[in-house]
């Protein structure tokens, strides 16, 4: 077998009909086929078309050259020291050109009789010269079933045959190399009458044409984007060097099955088959109750628990049950206060990786969701929805026991612990328990004496971030809490609430002004009492 047996040529007119992506696909496959033939020791000279492709020149040939190079291919293969054999009887010649070829395009092909189902093997013939005793490599072979006949490159149907990773048995029998075929989504070649349609090698349904495949996959091949649009990405990847090394890699437990669409590698062929469904969009496992389909049986099993209400994974600490084991693992971090996902920029830790990913958007400036009323921006749409309730006053989450309403579901969940008395967060040093993890974190600072929140202006440290924010307003002069009746502004919300009592008292009893001391006065009063000094007189409001 020579390179001419697998080469494809175009005339100048035919070459002009191809777009950029189709030409890139042609260059890549031709060079890969030449590399394969050379590695087998079957070709010594470098053909003119290969030189043109390596130089980036246009590889078209004069129209007078005979381009039906597939004629009598099977006979020529048997004449050499290597032969291409079938696992079944072969009768007749290989197809010389693809069916339905557009006018003016006569394309020679790599022989692919019954390409969807046949299994071919390369056998070493006795009596071969020593120069041809090189072992065949484990490189994937590309069989061209329908070369660039579509209007777009993603319509070209390419069959990828992955080399079997099993080591050949040590015996006197000729060494064989078997290829297993996997189909890449795209246009399927039309099948002659009385011939079964090509079946997807991934377990599932069979399709006779591209429209049926696209309808079943929901057009996923179009949504794949660059994976199908860029031939060099589709056909890229490094291959094992020799057949023996491929077998040794399998025995050593190394990954040997590679997806040609995304270069992901798997240890088992069954794992590759499952992965291929993400590209084809095939979902053969369907729920009998709602009709929803899944690509794996495990996903269907998890989904069916929604209908049955089964929650087999229970927390040993609090008894809460979950449908998925992963949900139980995330829940158990509440009890352990484990936060293994830490931000490399600010050091903030999170219990879930998804929360860390959202947090990183803050450093990157990624806050695409803006409030229409105040302009505040958020990295999540759910956070924006929660924030908008502060403007509307909406509190859709109501406690069934006491009727208290909340704007967030998490606030209701925490409130319900008041009724149940649940305190799942325990301090490891003193044993004190808390209903919230944030309260436990603040409590642990008492044991360590740590004050992680430090003011950049005066250097004063604080145990709570909220206290630092309030302290910073002393330096900035900011007073965000404004009285709606008189316009007076305050640095802290408690001070505003105390001030608003003046207006409410004036309405109920204009003759008796509110003499209730403010929070600052009471704090100073208590300090003097603790120090043994003479306390200031506490003014009490006049009785009506």
Curated annotation (Swiss-Prot):
Zn finger limits (C2H2-type): 257-279, 285-307, 313-335, 341-363, 369-391, 397-419, 425-447, 453-475, 481-503
GO molecular function, one term: DNA-binding transcription factor activity, RNA polymerase II-specific
Region span, Disordered: 184-222, 508-544
Swiss-Prot/TrEMBL GO biological process terms: regulation of transcription by RNA polymerase II
SMART domains recorded: KRAB (SM00349), ZnF_C2H2 (SM00355)
The KRAB domain, residue ranges: 1-72
Keywords: DNA-binding, Isopeptide bond, Metal-binding, Nucleus, Repeat, Transcription, Transcription regulation, Ubl conjugation, Zinc, Zinc-finger
Domain of life: Eukaryota
Pfam family, one: zf-C2H2
UniProt similarity note: Belongs to the krueppel C2H2-type zinc-finger protein family.
Name listed for the protein in its UniProt record: Zinc finger protein 324B
Name of the coding gene: ZNF324B
